[in-house]
Design a protein with these regions (language model features):
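Conserved acidic residues
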Residues: 24, 45, 90
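Conserved alpha-helix/loop element of class I SAM-dependent methyltransferases that forms part
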Residues: 5-24
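Class I SAM-dependent methyltransferase SAM/SAH-binding core
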Residues: 33-82
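A short, aliphatic-rich alpha-helical micro-motif
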Residues: 20-21, 41, 86
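A short acidic, Gly/Pro-enriched loop at the edge of an enzyme's catalytic core
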Residues: 80-91
């Protein structure tokens, strides 16, 4: 999927206006290639980012900034396959996901 450029970073501003990622354990459903993950990862405590597309996850892993690798876990996985223990995540994020 091609994504339109966002030179004014409107998407990131809106994301931070609506959610406080500071110190949170985040579940990102439909992370794709990680394009949105990088925009909040520096504030989150930890992230599990899932997507069913193995190619997108491979791209996300390849493009992941070194300073964020310890806090982001990328998985090739569908949401329906996720085993979510009670209260494991503080926040769930879905973007362009059905």
């Amino acid at each position: 999927m091609s994504v339109l450029p966002d030179p004014e970073d409107t998407e990131t501003k809106a994301l931070h206006d609506y959610a406080d990622f500071s110190g949170k354990r985040v579940l990102e459903i439909g992370c794709g290639d990680g394009r949105l993950t990088w925009r909040y990862a520096d504030r989150a405590a930890s992230i599990v980012a899932i997507d069913p597309d193995a190619d997108d996850i491979a791209t996300a892993l390849e493009d992941c900034p070194n300073d964020l690798r310890d806090k982001i876990e990328f998985r090739t996985q569908r949401f329906e396959e996720l085993d979510i223990p009670t209260e494991k995540f503080d926040l769930a994020l879905l973007s362009w996901s059905l």
